[in-house]
Every structure is written in structure tokens, then in C-alpha cells.
């Protein structure tokens, strides 16, 4: 699951 609110770096 992708964590929401984190910038995709």
C-alpha cells in the first residue's frame, strides 16, 4: 500500500 501524503521522490 502506498503511503498517502508523502512526496514521491
From Swiss-Prot:
Q: How is it modified after translation?
A: Photoregulated by reversible phosphorylation of its threonine residues.
Gene Ontology molecular function: any one? metal ion binding
Keywords, A to Z, come to:
Acetylation, Chlorophyll, Chloroplast, Chromophore, Magnesium, Membrane, Metal-binding, Phosphoprotein, Photosynthesis, Photosystem I, Photosystem II, Plastid, Thylakoid
- Modified positions (Phosphothreonine) in chain numbering: 3
Instruction: Please share the entry's free-text remark on the cofactor.
Output: Binds at least 14 chlorophylls (8 Chl-a and 6 Chl-b) and carotenoids such as lutein and neoxanthin.
Membrane topology, as annotated, equals:
Multi-pass membrane protein
| Chain ranges passing through the membrane | none
Q: Assign the protein's first listed, main location to one coarse class.
A: plastid
> What is its subcellular localisation?
Plastid, Chloroplast thylakoid membrane
State whether keyword Plastid applies.
Answer: yes
User: Residue positions of the PTM N2-acetylarginine?
Assistant: 1
Keyword Plastid among UniProt keywords: yes
Q: Which GO terms describe its biological process?
A: photosynthesis
Q: What's the domain of life for this entry? A: Eukaryota
Q: Name one GO cellular component term.
A: photosystem II
The annotated subunit structure for this chain is:
The LHC complex consists of chlorophyll a-b binding proteins.
Show the domain comment. The N-terminus of the protein extends into the stroma where it is involved with adhesion of granal membranes and post-translational modifications; both are believed to mediate the distribution of excitation energy between photosystems I and II.
Q: Which family does it belong to?
A: Belongs to the light-harvesting chlorophyll a/b-binding (LHC) protein family.
Job description of the protein: The light-harvesting complex (LHC) functions as a light receptor, it captures and delivers excitation energy to photosystems with which it is closely associated.
Official protein name in the record: Chlorophyll a-b binding protein
Tell me which species this is from: Spinacia oleracea
Query: What lineage, starting at the top, does this entry show?
Result: Eukaryota, Viridiplantae, Streptophyta, Embryophyta, Tracheophyta
